[in-house]
Amino acid sequence: MIRVLGIETSCDETAASVVALEGDAAPKILSNIVLSQIEEHAAFGGVVPEIAARAHVEALDGIVEAALADSGTTLADIDAIAATAGPGLVGGLIVGLMTAKAIAAAAGKPLIAVNHLEGHALTARLTDGLEFPYLLLLVSGGHTQILAVRGVGDYQRWATTIDDALGEAFDKTAKMLGLPYPGGPNVEKAAQTGNASRFTFPRPMKGSAQPDFSFSGLKTAVRQAATAIEPLGDQDVADICASFQAAVADALADRVSRALARFSQTFPGTKNPALVVAGGVAANHTIKATLERLCAEAGFIFVAPPLKLCTDNAAMIAWAGIERLREGMAQENGFDFVPRSRWPLDSISAPMVGSGRRGAKA
């Protein structure tokens, strides 16, 4: 049996988990502890890196102890320590990776530095036993990407955002409308009573031959609409949220439908092609329904891990560690690994800089 302790501190969740795998049996999440920092950041309308790092320092040792206790294991039972080493907020990454190094050194265990995005990319194999290859749509506060997942450590980025991540667009929209943080669930809640036809917002990149995403123009359109009808009433806010959400769903549908067609052409022999959606934005019911419909039309299986494993967690980091151990891909120099605020899964893909574009989102 392989048991790995995972640690995740890349943003505003302090998390630790123990995941086990025995032979050909399904993997087991023995513990999965996540401490959210929403209350600490709510007053600022977004994550403050310094506050996040200090909160990780205060909480991580207790979270690791709780994960071990809940799993019924001790460090002697653990085969390796896996920790997120990037991408993310560098202060939080330092806290998590240095803690993992200390634990691994003291216990005499291997240290596996894990790419946070790889954790998301491999979660469907933890929850659904999915076989390679498959298509991944990663939609979170920091990333919006489409990747072909061909194997452990083998990823092809087919699309990314050329400006804002989708989760960031949700958060900024919420802030403009006076909705509390986090923006995603509050925009979705307000949209439930809104008229999605009242405002005609742009569908960024729709119809473009370029495969990438863009959300800055949509965010600007929301601000202009809100400014034009100030002061905003509750129904105005609901209508803007519903119209914004509809525009996002349409834009995603256009980008993802192209990716599904490309996947079918690139991997024609795949028996059960699948689209996996991961990241916090994957919790949005309108977006999920849109993607499920697309998959049904294209003959793809739609896979969305449970919400607690879609958002940031340490079980996915522990599982990525297990996957790498099984493939003999654990770093020989894990203790020398330094945190990376930007760390693309597909190192071959060109950075999205130039031609009027802002810097790459990992």
UniProtKB/Swiss-Prot annotation:
Q: What class of enzyme is it?
A: transferase
Fetch the InterPro entries from UniProt.
Answer: ATPase_NBD (IPR043129), Gcp-like_dom (IPR000905), KAE1/TsaD (IPR017861), TsaD (IPR022450)
Q: Which GO terms describe its molecular function?
A: iron ion binding; N(6)-L-threonylcarbamoyladenine synthase activity
Mind naming one GO cellular-component term on file for this protein?
A: cytoplasm
Q: Its Gene Ontology biological processes?
A: tRNA threonylcarbamoyladenosine modification
* EC number of the protein: 2.3.1.234
Annotated positions binding Fe cation? H116, H120, D312
Which top-level group of life is the source organism from?
A: Bacteria
Cofactor(s) it depends on: Fe(2+)
- By its UniProt entry, which SUPFAM superfamilies does this protein fall under? Actin-like ATPase domain (SSF53067)
Give the transmembrane ranges.
none
Where is it located? Answer: Cytoplasm
The entry marks the following residues as binding substrate, namely L138, V139, S140, G141, G142, D171, G184, N284
**For this protein, what reaction is catalysed?**
L-threonylcarbamoyladenylate + adenosine(37) in tRNA = N(6)-L-threonylcarbamoyladenosine(37) in tRNA + AMP + H(+)
Recite the UniProt keywords alphabetically: Acyltransferase, Cytoplasm, Iron, Metal-binding, Transferase, tRNA processing
| Annotated S-S bridges | none
Cofactor binding: number and manner: Binds 1 Fe(2+) ion per subunit.
Q: Main localisation, per the record?
A: cytoplasm
Q: Which NCBIfam families match?
A: gcp_kae1 (TIGR00329), T6A_TsaD_YgjD (TIGR03723)
Q: Please report which protein family the annotation says this sequence is part of.
A: Belongs to the KAE1 / TsaD family.
Reported function: Required for the formation of a threonylcarbamoyl group on adenosine at position 37 (t(6)A37) in tRNAs that read codons beginning with adenine. Is involved in the transfer of the threonylcarbamoyl moiety of threonylcarbamoyl-AMP (TC-AMP) to the N6 group of A37, together with TsaE and TsaB. TsaD likely plays a direct catalytic role in this reaction.
Q: What is this protein called?
A: tRNA N6-adenosine threonylcarbamoyltransferase
Q: Which source organism?
A: Mesorhizobium japonicum (strain LMG 29417 / CECT 9101 / MAFF 303099)
Taxonomic lineage is: Bacteria, Pseudomonadati, Pseudomonadota, Alphaproteobacteria, Hyphomicrobiales
Q: Which gene encodes it?
A: tsaD
